[in-house]
Amino acid sequence: MEPTMGGEMESGGGAATGECVNRIPVPRPPSIEEFTIVKPISRGAFGKVYLGQKGNRLYAVKVVKKADMINKNMTHQVQAERDALALSKSPFIVHLYYSLQSANNVYLVMEYLIGGDVKSLLHIYGYFDEEMAVKYISEVALALDYLHRHGIIHRDLKPDNMLISNEGHIKLTDFGLSKVTLNRDIDINMMDILTTPSMAKPRQDYSRTPGQVLSLISSLGFHTPVAEGNHDTANVLSTQVSETSPLSQGLTCPMSVDQKDTTPYSSKLLKSCPEMVASHPRMPVKCLTSHLLQSRKRLATSSTSSPSHTFISSMESECHSSPRWEKDCQESDDAAGSTMMSWNTVEKPLCTKSVDAMETKSFNERDLELALSPIHNSSVVPATGNSYVNLAKKCSSGEVSWEARELDVNNINMTADTSQYCFHESNQRAVDSGGMTEEHLGKRSCKRIFELVDSSPRQGIIPNKKSCFEYECSNEMRDCYATQRTGFAFEVQDLKLLVYRDQQNDCVNKENVGSSFTDKHQTPEKSPVPMIEKNLMCELDDDCDKNSKKDYLSSSFLCSDGDRTPKSIHMDSDSSFPGISIMESPLGGQSLDPDKNIKESSLEESNIEDLLPVSPSCQESTLPKGVECPTIQDSNQKMLAPSSEVLKPLTSKRNAVAFRSFNSHINASNSSEPSKMSITSLDMMDVSCAYSGSYPTAITPTQRERSDMPYQQTPNQVKSETPYRTPKSVRRGAAPVDDGRILGTPDYLAPELLLARAHGPAVDWWALGVCLFEFLTGIPPFNDETPQQVFQNILKRDIPWPEGEEKLSDNAQSAVDILLTIDDTKRAGMKELKHHPLFSGVDWENLQHQKMPFIPQPDDETDTSYFEARNNAQHLTVSGFSL
């Protein structure tokens, strides 16, 4: 007879007395396989959302592809989104239940809000009346106040990310661009989740099961996906070996790892291969680690920005790839006989393939690397290595009947696809595009993406950046502007802000320049303005009164004021930032249309390399001690006036705005050699119309060794763990925020983000002001045909206030004004809103209990029709599943 719970406890306690002991199975960690797919809901810029079911409860499951996040250099943002949702326990923020992952995807399991998003509701209503808008803005303001008090900045606030609950209340979601500040360098822990600061007496609504807590504190493993069943190899090859996963001693199989006290299946999941040892006793694991560790150091394939993410998460099963939730992109693996492993099949013996069949093949080092490489493309692996690859991948051979139920989302058509909003060079692969052209397969990128990897990572050092002639960055990129809308969040690739300059301010001093970089096809008078290479986006202010300092500079870029048109140059080669644009235009005859009067040119790599060697005398005299460097003023303050006053302070100086292209990578150098050049201080750069300075002073580490490059040291350089970041000694002003990229939806970006200034919670209040205007009028205040024009409208604060019968009330217009204040230090926040006349009738203490103007009336609990309006507006056709 089955013992009762009390009997179990008694038998457990009486083990010493000889009573019968009942074995209690150890609970398994939560898995995505426990959820059933119902239907897709919607799609965003960085992931897809599906309706999932576990038991009798429905969940919204956000699926993010690891490969996409690695390619976009946004792995830290997925971690930030998980942390922000896990830390938040507010009635106005979506609740996160699980954070799961597989070899290829990350799954955020959240509560499903059946009312859809506010953007869809706004499309149906057209615009909201003032009372309705005030209620929605009030609840969002409380959510923002909660986040800011807990060190979280949303940074992507917009109606699309406001969901409507069953009772009609607002909840914020999509923290993919958020910033989480914990005032420490470690990830969130269990205490952060169980006892958040605002919950002195936690409510039952926010309680979590042990499995949920375990999933939320697990480390997200953003290594590149490996062969199924070969996850242990990544641990073995890691620079640090976990105590729970020590490297097996002696002559063992490369896959053998002795894990103790893990899951009940660990003894069956991790086995040594005696056949392998017997057949090849001279190839122990130690023979492989040195080479593969060197490859990892060069290619950074199995680590993220945080050292704590080096290991594969304990929540990720060793041979678990969730076939029901993801589609295997390597179809050739099935042809080779490899199968994916799930919890259903973990009890099957490992290494079922006989090793005797391989004894006739040469077990050389390259084949082992192919078998143990973190990622590979089995379709292009040489035949000599296929058997070893299959050995490492073939963990089991059974029960794949349910694998046919794969998620099919290839019918999600987007005429306004996210890739269209990425302003990319024409030859660079768009992240969301369907595939790679043949010509691109031969060009190796610094990011190890599946389509491009066709050999061992231990081959020659991969070139970090393409040469400049591989980019066609003029007409094609500008042509895509005309058809773009600005509703999607995306990464701004080539942000071009036209900055006015004085027509009479001519700083070109051609005679004092020792040597100049001029294209062989151009005269010195028409030399292109170079990009300013800096590790963070910055706005550089010219000082044209210090021409005498150019005598000490070895080379310069020349431009003439005779050329009055805006200039944009995309220079790659060994430059730090491919795709950075500098645009200058005269005060007179200025047009805001980026398609007009733009001259673009590029410096060919061959010409640059010919000019790179610098004599010792030049490098020593780059900047003498006694010379005071030109100051780089924060000209952002000059942009703080309304549109009628913006141009006035800019007429005395000429400004150049340099912005990073988002196809360039942060810390993207794959080279393991020490830096050939440290990024020199901006003190040594004369940022004038003749951008002077020795060219190598702004070069980041490259893949190619150049013995003729001189070393230049930055004064008082601070040693850093990451040698490829800008040293702190050369940074001016406020500490840089994150990686300096501009992320978000153009219409809702705050001016400080566009101007690359340090930003804080004020960016969310700016976005709230944009949302308030949009609720009252139906369109965002800075909306325009192209993102470029939107950015100009934001910087000018060009707001088209409704007139006549559509005129907003004085209180509403005043509320928008105080939120849309250019100066972030004077921008309104929660305190100002509570005392504003527009919100005088709001009961801030009982907002979650107030009656809302719109309450969803779905057909059933799986109804997703409230999301359709937004999907249709963005031309998203969400298909079902092909089972």
From Swiss-Prot:
GO terms for molecular function: ATP binding; protein phosphatase 2A binding; protein serine kinase activity; protein serine/threonine kinase activity. Its EC number is 2.7.11.1. It comes from the Eukaryota. The modification N-acetylmethionine is found at M1. The modification Phosphoserine is found at S295, S373, S456, S556, S560, S635, S661, S672, S729, S879, S882. Phosphorylation at Thr-745 by CDK1 during M phase activates its kinase activity. Maximum phosphorylation occurs in prometaphase. Serine/threonine kinase that plays a key role in M phase by acting as a regulator of mitosis entry and maintenance. Acts by promoting the inactivation of protein phosphatase 2A (PP2A) during M phase: does not directly inhibit PP2A but acts by mediating phosphorylation and subsequent activation of ARPP19 and ENSA at 'Ser-62' and 'Ser-67', respectively. ARPP19 and ENSA are phosphatase inhibitors that specifically inhibit the PPP2R2D (PR55-delta) subunit of PP2A. Inactivation of PP2A during M phase is essential to keep cyclin-B1-CDK1 activity high. This is Serine/threonine-protein kinase greatwall. It comes from Bos taurus. The lineage of its organism: Eukaryota, Metazoa, Chordata, Craniata, Vertebrata.
